[in-house]
Amino acid sequence: MGSPCALGLFCCCSSCFCLCCPRHRPASRLAAVVGGAAAVPAVVSGVTGLILSPSPSPIFIQPTPSPPMSFHNPGLELALDSRPAPLXPLGVTSPSAPPLPPVVDLPQLGLRR
């Protein structure tokens, strides 16, 4: 029927697009399997996760749910922090920032037009 697939599926090149099949690998990034090896060719919309299929019944891919935020990762705290960053008033520099050099006027450098 089909050659064994590395994903544990069977690839029938006449009826499905398989990631493991060298003929179909550039054409499709998704192993569309509906009812075993009898799958329909599908076009995947990466934005919505919806498969546009020529079959009369629509096929939907549900995005994988994100893991619960109960784990503590210090690297993700900054990205997931919902509090706005404190803003300093204009004209006040941070103590850790070096002072800006004074503005140099062009005539002081001897450059003339």
Swiss-Prot record:
Residues 71-113 are annotated as: Homodimerization, and interaction with host AMBP/bikunin. The keyword Lipoprotein applies. The keyword Membrane applies. Residues 27-67 are annotated as: Interaction with host HPX. Keywords: Host cell membrane, Host cytoplasm, Host cytoskeleton, Host endoplasmic reticulum, Host membrane, Host-virus interaction, Lipoprotein, Membrane, Phosphoprotein, Virion. Residues 47-71 are annotated as: Interaction with the capsid protein. InterPro entries: HEV_Orf2. Residues 90-113 are annotated as: Disordered. Residues 94-103 are annotated as: Interaction with host SRC, HCK, FYN, PIK3R3 and GRB2. It holds the Pfam family HEV_ORF1. Its main location: host cell. It is a lipid-anchor. It is found in: Host endoplasmic reticulum membrane; Host cytoplasm, Host cytoskeleton; Virion; Host cell membrane. Palmitoylated in the N-terminus. The modification Phosphoserine is found at residue 70. One of its GO terms (cellular component) is host cell endoplasmic reticulum membrane. The viral particles present in feces and bile are non-enveloped, while those in circulating blood and culture supernatants are covered with a cellular membrane (quasi-enveloped). The PSAP motif is necessary for the release of membrane-wrapped virions from infected cells. Small multifunctional phosphoprotein involved in virion morphogenesis, egress and counteracting host innate immunity. Plays critical roles in the final steps of viral release by interacting with host TSG101, a member of the vacuolar protein-sorting pathway and using other cellular host proteins involved in vesicle formation pathway. Also acts as a viroporin and forms ion conductive pores allowing viral particle release. Impairs the generation of type I interferon by down-regulating host TLR3 and TLR7 as well as their downstream signaling pathways. Forms homooligomers. Interacts with host SRC, HCK, FYN, PIK3R3 and GRB2 (via SH3 domain); binding does not activate the kinases. Interacts with host AMBP/bikunin and AMBP/alpha-1-microglobulin peptides. Interacts with host HPX/hemopexin. Interacts (when phosphorylated) with capsid protein ORF2. Interacts with host TSG101; this interaction plays a role in viral release from the host cell. Interacts with host SIRPA; this interaction down-regulates the phosphorylation of host IRF3. Belongs to the hepevirus ORF3 protein family. This is Protein ORF3.
